[in-house]
Amino acid sequence: LSLNATVGASINDIQEDAMYLKGGLEQIPNFFHYGNINVNTSKRNESKWHDQVQSVFASAELGWNHQLYLTVTGRNDWASQLAFTSKGSYFYPSVGLSWLVSESVKLPKAISYLKVRGSWAEVASSPNRYLTQMQYTYNEQTNTYEYPASHYNTNLKPENTKSWELGVNAKFLGNRINLDMTFYRSNTFNQTFYVDASASSGYKNNICLLYTSPSPRD
C-alpha cells in the first residue's frame, strides 16, 4: 500500500496602473516621446485594475500492490472578480481510478501491457473583472468618463466544467503496437454572455449566464 499527498496554498495577484498617450508627432520626425506629441491631436487613456485569486488545494494518491491507484484532488478559490456577489469562492474536486490489468491477470502473450482508467473532474474559473459592479469607462475622444455599455450583474457565478472520462491503454507484440483510447463527455455551466438591453435602460446590453453547454464526444 502506498500513499502520496500534497497540501498547499497560493495567491495570484496581478495589477496594472498605466496611462497611454497617442497622437501625431509635433516637430522632430521619428522621435517618439510624449513631449513631441501634437497637443491638438493627442488622445489619452488610462488603465488601472487589480485582480487577485487566493487558493488552497490538496491531492492524494492511494496505490495498492502496484496495480490499483485512486487519485483525489480538491481546490478552493476566492476570486476578486466575484466581489459583490453571493458566490465569492468556489470549490472544484476530481477523482480518478486506474487499474493495471496486466499486473493482476495473466493475459495472452500478444498483450504486453493493459491498463483501464476512469475519472470525474470539475474545473472552475472566474468571469472577467468589473462585471459585478458599476464601472465607468474612459472615452478618449472626449476625455471624460461615461456609463458602461453593459449593465452589471451581481448574480454571476464562476464558469464550471464537469467532465468524466473512460480510457484504455494497451501494448501488443512486445510493445511494437500501442493503443490509447479515450471516451469522454463534458458540460460547461454558467458561461457569461451578453444580450441586447432595452433602449430605455440606458445600457447597450445585459450580462447574463448560460446554464449548460454540452461538448462533443471523442
Model-based region annotation:
Residues L1-S213, R217:
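Extracellular/periplasmic, surface-exposed regions of secreted and cell-surface proteins
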